[in-house]
């Protein structure tokens, strides 16, 4: 493959093509351009002050009560997912 001719050795119509800038490597092109400044982030608006945590506490209390009720009934599985021994005995006796 022939090497590119330098603009000094250009003759005739080839000289017009070589008047353009030679392509450079990508890293050289990117480093030549100044980095545009990043716009500063706008401060987020804070909502009106309410009693802190009232909504969270209500939800947490409701969930705790549901878990306690389910535990009282004896239908909820234990923490590790195993069934209780009483449930196993009752299912085997019915068969």
UniProtKB/Swiss-Prot annotation:
Cystine residue pairs: none
Location within or outside the cell: Nucleus
Subunit: Interacts with the ligand binding domain of the thyroid receptor (TR) (in vitro). Requires the presence of thyroid hormone for its interaction. Interacts with transcriptional regulator SEHBP. Interacts with nucleosomes.
Record family assignment: Belongs to the HMGN family.
Biased composition (Basic and acidic residues): 1-25, 39-53, 62-72
A Pfam cross-reference name: HMG14_17
Gene Ontology biological-process annotations: chromatin organization; positive regulation of transcription by RNA polymerase II; regulation of insulin secretion involved in cellular response to glucose stimulus; regulation of transcription by RNA polymerase II; transcription by RNA polymerase II
PROSITE patterns associated with the record: HMG14_17
Residues bearing PTM Phosphoserine: 6, 78
Name of the featured protein: High mobility group nucleosome-binding domain-containing protein 3
Region (Disordered) residue spans: 1-95
MF (Gene Ontology): chromatin binding; nucleosomal DNA binding
GO CC entries: chromatin; nucleus
InterPro entries according to UniProt: HMGN_fam
Organism, as annotated: Rattus norvegicus (Rat)
Keyword Lyase listed: no
Role: Binds to nucleosomes, regulating chromatin structure and consequently, chromatin-dependent processes such as transcription, DNA replication and DNA repair. Affects both insulin and glucagon levels and modulates the expression of pancreatic genes involved in insulin secretion. Regulates the expression of the glucose transporter SLC2A2 by binding specifically to its promoter region and recruiting PDX1 and additional transcription factors.
Primary localization: nucleus
Taxonomy, superkingdom: Eukaryota
């Amino acid at each position: 493959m022939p090497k590119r001719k330098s603009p000094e050795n250009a003759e005739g119509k080839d000289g017009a093509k070589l008047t353009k800038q030679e392509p450079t490597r990508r890293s050289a092109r990117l480093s030549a351009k100044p980095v545009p400044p990043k716009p500063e982030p706008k401060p987020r608006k804070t909502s009106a002050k309410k009693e802190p945590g009232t909504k969270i506490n209500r939800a947490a209390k409701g969930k705790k009560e549901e878990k306690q009720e389910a535990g009282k009934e004896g239908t909820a599985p234990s923490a590790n997912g195993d069934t209780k021994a009483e449930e196993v005995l009752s299912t085997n006796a019915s068969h």
